[in-house]
């Protein structure tokens, strides 16, 4: 039985000069937390990865000012994970998303799962 494709896009902020609680208070976005990591998931399930990345771009745009301030004190990355289609698959990072991530000094971490 073939598994359904899945995807996930998560904006992550690593506690550095700020605690995870301080990061959450500064960003005012409901998110998952651990001792060293604050993260917000753009969704998943049946959404296509391109749609998830558009959600991330909208989130970055909406909270840009606060994210820039936090990114000056903490490492930020975008964790992108998906099961690619058999053969060949692609991911599109649009210019707006790239510009916003660049402004934060954020890395993009790509994680794929294949059989």
Indicate residue ranges for each PLM-predicted region.
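Acidic (Asp/Glu-rich) sequence patches and key acidic residues
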Residues: 1-115
């Amino acid at each position: 039985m073939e598994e359904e494709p899945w995807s996930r896009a998560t904006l992550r902020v690593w506690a550095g000069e700020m605690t995870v609680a301080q990061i959450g208070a500064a960003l005012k976005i409901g998110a998952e937390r651990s001792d060293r990591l604050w993260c917000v998931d753009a969704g998943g399930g049946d959404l296509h990865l391109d749609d998830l990345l558009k959600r991330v771009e909208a989130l970055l745009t909406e909270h840009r000012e606060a994210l820039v301030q936090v990114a000056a004190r903490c490492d930020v990355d975008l964790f992108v994970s998906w099961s690619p289609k058999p053969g060949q698959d692609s991911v599109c990072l649009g210019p707006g998303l790239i510009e916003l991530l660049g402004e934060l000094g954020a890395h993009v971490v790509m994680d794929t799962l294949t059989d």
